[in-house]
Structures are given as C-alpha cells and as structure tokens.
Amino acid sequence: MSLSGQLWKMVNSTSPNAAATVGNIAYCYVLPCICAIGIVGNITNLMVLASRRLRAVSYMYLRALAVADLLCMLFVLVFVSTEYLAKNGSSINQYKLYQIYQCHLMLTLINWALGAGVYVVVALSLERYISIVFPMHFRTWNSPQRATRAIVIAFLIPAIFYVPYAITRYKGKQRFDLLQNVTIYSMDDHPIYTTFYWQIYKWTREAILRFLPIIILTVLNIQIMIAFRKRQKMFQQLTNKRKEQGTQKDDTLMYMLGGTVLMSLVCNIPAAINLLLIDETLKKRLDYQIFRAVANILEITNHASQFYVFCACSTDYRTTFLQKFPCFKTDYANRDRLRSFVRRTQSVIQKQGSVEHTTNSKVWIMFKNKFQRDSLSHHSRKFSRHMPIEQDTVDIQLASGEQSTSGEMCEADTLIKYGGTAQLCNDENNTTFL
C-alpha cells in the first residue's frame, strides 16, 4: 500500500475522535470569543446610533444591521453554550424543551438572523448605489418610510424561507438511560430531508438567501466604484490638480467597498456550500468537520466585524462615539496628532523638494545671466579700445564717483543699459536677480 493510502486509512480510522476535537476547538473556544467581540461592538454601535446626531436614513439601515448581527451573535452564543453543556455531562439533554429548541429553533434562528443581516446590507448598498449613480432621483426616492419597508422586508424574507426548515428539517428522538434512570432527548435527520422536493426547496432557499445577495452586492459595489472613478477623473480634468484629501477619501471608500465585496465572497460562499452538503453522515468525517468549522467561523466573523468596517469610515459616527464615550478622546487625539505630524512631515519634504528644484533653476538662471553680463562687458572693453569715450559719458562716470582710469565700463552702467529688456525676479529672501 502506498504512503498516501496509509495516511488516508489512518485519517479515516481516527476521524471520529479528530472530528470531535475540531468541533470542540471551533465551537467551544473560537466562536465564543468572536461572539463576545460582536456583542460588545454591536451594543456599543446601537448606543451610538441612538444619538439625535445620526438620524439620516442611511443610519436606519445601520441600526437594523446592528440589531440583526447582535441577534445572530446571541443565538450563536446560546447554541455554543448548550452544545458545550450537553457534551460535558450536563443534564440539559434530559429536558423536552431542549429537544424542541434543538429541532426547531437552534439553527433556524441563527440562519434567519444571518439572512436578515445580509439583506439589510443589500438594501444599504442599493440606497448608496442610487445616491451615487442617480443623484437627481435620490432625494425623492430616499425616505424614512421607504427605508422602514425595506428593513421589514429584509427581516421577513429569511423568516419565510426558513419556516419549512424549522418544521421539518429535524425530528426528535429519545432513549432511556438505564444507568441514570432518565430519558435522554436528542435530534436526528427527518426522512423528508432526502426527498426530491426537499432538495428543490433547499437549493432555492440557498440561491435566494446566499448566492443572490452576493451577486447583487458585487454588481452594486462595482458600479459604485466605477462611478467614483469617473467622478475622480472629471474632477481632476476640471481642476487640473493632483489627488488631494477629497480624492483620498474617495479612494478609502472604494477600498472599503472592494473589501466588502471580497468579504462577502470569501465568508458567505463556504457557509452556503456547507448548508447544502450537511448531513449526519458527513459530520463524522474529519475533512468535512474542518471545512464546516472554517465556514462557520468565517461567516460569524463577517457579521461580527462588518459593522466596524461600515462605521469606522464615518466621521459623524466617530464624533458621536467620542461624545458618548469621552474616555477614548485622549487616545483618539493622540492618533490624530500622529497623523497630523506624518502629514506635515510629508508636506515639508515635498515642499523642500519643490524649493530645491526652484532654487536650482534660479541659480542656473543667475549663472546664465552672469555669463551674459561678463560676455557683454568683455565685448564692451574690446569696443572701448578702438572707439574713444564720449565726454558726457565720462562726466557721468565721474559724477557717480566710479573710477574710469582703467577704461572699463562699470557693471551698473551695463545693468542700466540692459535693464529695460531684462526681467527682474525676486526669490523668497527678496533678493533681486535677472
């Protein structure tokens, strides 16, 4: 047998224990930490967004997104806690209520909150797309009533699609433990799960709740980035300037939109594939457990962190956050001072480079003009040897107190003669030169 075959056999023989280990690490240690970060962040965001300062329609979508993500983090934390208790000898699996929660609520609530968050992001991206691409129609189209209807629809669509999942996906089973003299409740796959009609429902649900939002987000955000690029080029052509602070903010927004698209693709597609493939047989395989753990962690991380990404790019949000939590003002001020120092340093370096280039040009002009003056003086001296100096010129030279015994023309006279055609320039020290 080849080495690869031996390794494959070894993995398959130890896969149940290894799969359980992977599941314990992912769901008992990693996911609770991510959920804690998401819960703290979204509660903070709801407190900040409750301010009167942030009453624009766009912030309605952000508040709805915070609610959906907060519910998702809470549902995941409850799921992880109950699974941990059930696997570590707790009596929680001896209650019928826990079986009802496992079969009909546990995964349904998590997936409903995830789907609602995704559709809220779609509604927010659509609002942003109309404001950028169709600014003339945005004022009449955008209203709190329309935003409220969009948010309600975003929460209703996943709920409707997950009703059959909640009712028929799993069935309850029970066994009597003779050692403990108690009834143990658990869940198992329902037979309807293998039927053709269920497969149609499953693929339709995942296509509408997972893949369709990813496609919509990708198309909308790409269109927004293209519109920003066109606006940047138009601005640069009209003003004939290089990139400044405004265009740098546009670049930051485009990077944020591109990151949103990338996060949607990377974090949501594996989770969608996982929901299409999952069954009790696959759960015993090590490779599937690794894929499932990574997919779930990516999806939860996306929903725990995407609100930070949206709000970190809003100046109004940061200002309101510092008003709500003044203890962070010192750190924020220190960071601003550091950024200001870096910007000033870069500006000084660029200015010094520009001044050095200008000074070199001016020195070259001075050297060129000095060479021309020396050449003119030399020709004048040659001309004076052959032509006598007129009396009035000598009188002027003597009256000015300059020596004329050498027969040389003074440089001041040359400047007077040619000053009418020479261009005088002043440098930064008010030094005049040709």
UniProtKB/Swiss-Prot annotation:
Which residues are noted as glycosylation sites? N12, N88, N181, N429, N430
- Family annotation (Pfam families): 7tm_1
Q: Which domain of life is it from?
A: Eukaryota
Q: Which InterPro entries match?
A: GPCR-like (IPR053093), GPCR_Rhodpsn (IPR000276), GPCR_Rhodpsn_7TM (IPR017452)
* Coiled-coil ranges (or none): none
One cellular component (GO) term of this entry: plasma membrane
The record gives the membrane topology as: Multi-pass membrane protein
Q: Which residues cross the membrane?
A: 30-50, 65-85, 105-125, 147-167, 208-228, 258-278
Q: Where in the cell is it found?
A: Cell membrane
- Keywords for this entry? Cell membrane, G-protein coupled receptor, Glycoprotein, Membrane, Receptor, Transducer, Transmembrane, Transmembrane helix
GO molecular function annotation? G protein-coupled receptor activity
Q: Of which family is this protein a member?
A: Belongs to the G-protein coupled receptor 1 family.
What does the UniProt function comment say about this protein? Not known. Putative receptor.
Q: Give the protein name, as stated in the record.
A: Probable G-protein coupled receptor B0563.6
Organism expressing this protein natively: Caenorhabditis elegans
